[in-house]
C-alpha cells in the first residue's frame, strides 16, 4: 500500500468505526489516554470458554490516528488469546496502520494496544490469584 492508501484506510476507520460501543457482559474493561493529544480510549473484551477473545469493542474520542487504530485493533485481536494479545508487537501494529503515516504520532497509534495489553495482564494476574 502507498501512503495515500494508508491515509484512506485510517480515515475510513475513523469516520466509520468498527466495533464501537460498550460491550455487556465484558470480562475485560480498561481505559487510558494520551494527555498530549487529548485521546481517550476504553476497550471492552469478552472471552469464550477457551480463553479467546470472542468480542472486542471500544469507545473513545481523540485524534484520527488513535480512534482509527483502536477500531482496527478490535478486528486484529479478535479470536486471539490473552497471551497472544500480550505478545502483539507495537511495531507490527504501526506497520498495519502505515508506518510512514503514523510515525509522527506513535503514542496515538499504539494507545489502544497499550490499554489492551495492560488489561490482558491484569486479567491474567487476577485469574492466577483466584486459582491459588
Which residues fall in each region the model found?
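Short, glycine/acidic-enriched capping/hinge loops at junctions between secondary-structure elements
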Residues: 42-44, 56, 69
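Catalytic-loop motifs flanking and including active-site residues across diverse enzymes
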Residues: 65-70, 108-111
Amino acid at each position: 500500500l502507498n501512503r495515500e492508501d494508508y491515509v484512506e484506510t485510517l480515515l475510513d476507520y475513523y469516520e466509520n468505526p468498527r466495533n464501537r460501543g460498550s460491550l455487556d457482559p465484558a470480562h475485560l474493561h480498561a481505559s487510558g489516554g494520551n494527555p498530549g493529544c487529548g485521546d481517550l480510549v476504553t476497550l471492552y473484551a469478552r472471552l469464550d470458554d477457551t480463553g479467546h477473545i470472542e468480542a472486542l469493542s471500544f469507545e473513545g474520542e481523540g485524534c484520527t490516528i488513535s480512534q482509527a487504530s483502536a477500531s482496527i485493533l478490535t478486528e486484529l485481536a479478535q479470536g486471539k488469546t490473552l497471551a497472544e494479545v500480550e505478545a502483539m508487537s507495537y511495531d507490527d501494529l504501526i506497520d498495519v496502520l502505515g508506518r510512514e503515516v503514523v510515525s509522527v504520532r506513535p503514542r496515538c497509534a499504539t494507545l489502544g494496544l497499550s490499554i489492551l495489553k495492560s488489561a490482558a495482564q491484569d486479567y491474567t494476574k487476577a485469574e492466577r490469584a483466584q486459582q491459588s
